[in-house]
């Protein structure tokens, strides 16, 4: 994957090889992690720590219909598609996925009209992990391919623990 930024957005370009695309869960809030999807994990201030039911970090699950889902503070899945612009194209077995993301701080409040994205600038340090969930036809996700190595425990803990994210330094 590649990352660039402007003062108002983070841009990510991902390339994946997948011979079978699956989106069997039509309700975007149900088992969204078990369909083919791009996951982008962002910790605005690289503070690490738990973000399972808070916004210390976001775990955007980008579906094949370009919706962005994460778990809210009420412990239920929510659409955060208003944070993300997502488009993908398929070329044979190759998937090219382009994403533009508004970055929010950990004081984000679900449902509030007062949430404002943070401004990005050179030198800012953020936490980032990118993963692809792959399902080739079973009921559950078959593969989780991530950008960061998880040394011990379950390998898919990025949706809980921002301490697993890599360090992203915004450079000029």
Positions of predicted regions on the chain:
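Structural preference for beta-rich elements and adjacent junctions enriched in aromatics
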Residues: 1-172
């Amino acid at each position: 994957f590649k990352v660039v930024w402007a003062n108002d957005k983070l841009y990510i370009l991902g390339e994946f090889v997948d011979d079978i695309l699956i989106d069997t869960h039509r309700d975007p809030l149900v088992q969204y992690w078990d369909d083919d999807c791009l996951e982008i994990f962002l910790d605005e201030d690289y503070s690490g720590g738990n973000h399972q039911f808070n916004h210390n970090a976001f775990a955007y699950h980008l579906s094949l219909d370009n919706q962005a889902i994460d778990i809210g503070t009420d412990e239920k899945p929510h659409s955060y598609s208003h944070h993300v612009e997502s488009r993908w194209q398929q070329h044979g077995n190759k998937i090219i996925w382009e994403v533009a993301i508004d970055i929010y701080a950990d004081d984000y409040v679900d449902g509030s009209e007062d949430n404002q994205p943070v401004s990005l600038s050179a030198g800012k340090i953020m936490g980032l992990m990118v993963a692809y969930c792959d399902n080739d036809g079973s009921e559950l996700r078959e593969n989780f391919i991530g950008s960061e190595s998880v040394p011990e425990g379950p390998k898919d803990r990025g949706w809980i623990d921002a301490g697993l994210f890599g360090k992203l330094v915004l450079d000029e």
